[in-house]
């Protein structure tokens, strides 16, 4: 019998492999993405100190009523970029969390770039 691999386990293995190569610092924090079925979350993380510097998600009150999940992701990208620039973090390391750079992840990344983040 052929067994189909679990997509989330495959993503977690891919994410662990990438996380071994990238790390965030206080000068250049890591922009981490987590995508669930309903929401998307973004965090700026300083891995050296082990602290979250800024965060945004579709659960925030600042997110206006989007027409779809891709538009909501773009709003989250803009919000995390504004919060990061306000805290003085302009250059970040992008961590897509093992997800493909497509759809909601790409929309968040492009909106973050348009609003002042460099990666």
UniProtKB/Swiss-Prot annotation:
Keywords: Ribonucleoprotein, Ribosomal protein, RNA-binding, rRNA-binding. Residues 1-23 are annotated as: Disordered. GO terms for biological process: translation. GO terms for molecular function: 5S rRNA binding; structural constituent of ribosome. InterPro entries: Ribosomal_uL18_bac-type, Ribosomal_uL18_bac/euk. Transmembrane segments: none annotated. Residues 10-20 have a biased composition (Basic residues). GO terms for cellular component: cytosolic large ribosomal subunit. Belongs to the universal ribosomal protein uL18 family. Part of the 50S ribosomal subunit; part of the 5S rRNA/L5/L18/L25 subcomplex. Contacts the 5S and 23S rRNAs. This is one of the proteins that bind and probably mediate the attachment of the 5S RNA into the large ribosomal subunit, where it forms part of the central protuberance. This is Large ribosomal subunit protein uL18. The lineage of its organism: Bacteria, Bacillati, Bacillota, Bacilli, Lactobacillales.
